[in-house]
């Protein structure tokens, strides 16, 4: 009996459950105490390191049975996501609304990338084939990406009416500023 598939799937599920629990108990309350841009930036940093997907070439060389097309799909999606995340951080730090737009783009890109990677993994029978660093990325980093993109989407929706930055908050009428502070 091959225990590799249930081991990987089980480990991914457990990690996902733990990250969701951490997000509920600790991350969500912490985000609520931050300005919108700061909350988004904190969540974006997880995505900046998606270039770790370049490791797929080493895994492929060492016997991970992914096709070159499948590897390139992963690289394009994850390196692209890392670039979008970093650009969004830069723009949010400058107070530019384009940073929020890039956050939405990252949510859509990550959802698409995740779907395509799952589809490719099924088509190429990759579940349970990972080992070493590839296994660690799939079991720990991928669930972190999934949870952080969920939190990112939640922050974008829940805080869509907040001013973009502290400067805009100071320009609000006094009563409007008090309403925002009570949130």
Segments from the language model and where they lie:
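Non-cytosolic membrane-interface motifs at loop->transmembrane helix junctions
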Residues: 4-5, 65-76, 127-138
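Hydrophobic cores of alpha-helical transmembrane segments in multi-pass inner/ER membrane proteins
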Residues: 12-24, 80-88, 140-155
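Membrane-interface helix-boundary motifs at transmembrane edges
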Residues: 27-40, 93-99, 161-162
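C-terminal ends of transmembrane alpha-helices
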Residues: 51-62, 111-128
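Membrane-proximal helix-loop-helix units in multi-pass membrane proteins
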Residues: 53-102
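Hydrophobic alpha-helical membrane segments
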Residues: 77, 81-85, 102-122, 142-145
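C-terminal transmembrane-bundle signature of multipass membrane proteins
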Residues: 116-123, 135-163
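Short, highly charged, low-complexity non-transmembrane loops/tails of multi-pass membrane proteins
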Residues: 161-183
């Amino acid at each position: 009996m091959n225990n590799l598939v249930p081991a990987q799937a089980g480990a991914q599920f457990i990690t996902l459950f733990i990250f969701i629990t951490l997000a509920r108990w600790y991350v969500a309350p912490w985000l609520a105490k931050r300005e919108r841009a700061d909350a988004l930036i904190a969540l974006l940093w997880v995505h900046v390191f998606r270039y770790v997907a370049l490791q797929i070439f080493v895994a492929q060389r060492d016997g991970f049975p992914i096709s070159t097309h499948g590897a390139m799909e992963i690289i394009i999606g994850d390196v692209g996501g890392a670039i979008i995340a970093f650009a969004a951080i830069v723009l949010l730090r400058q107070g530019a609304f384009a940073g929020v737009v890039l956050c939405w783009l990252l949510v859509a890109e990550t959802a698409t990338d995740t779907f395509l990677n799952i589809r490719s993994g099924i088509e190429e029978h990759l579940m349970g084939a990972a080992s070493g660093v590839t296994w660690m990325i799939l079991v720990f980093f991928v669930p972190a990406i999934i949870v952080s993109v969920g939190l990112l989407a939640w922050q974008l929706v829940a805080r869509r009416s907040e001013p973009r930055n502290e400067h805009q908050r100071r320009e609000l009428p006094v009563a409007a500023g008090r309403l925002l502070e009570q949130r």
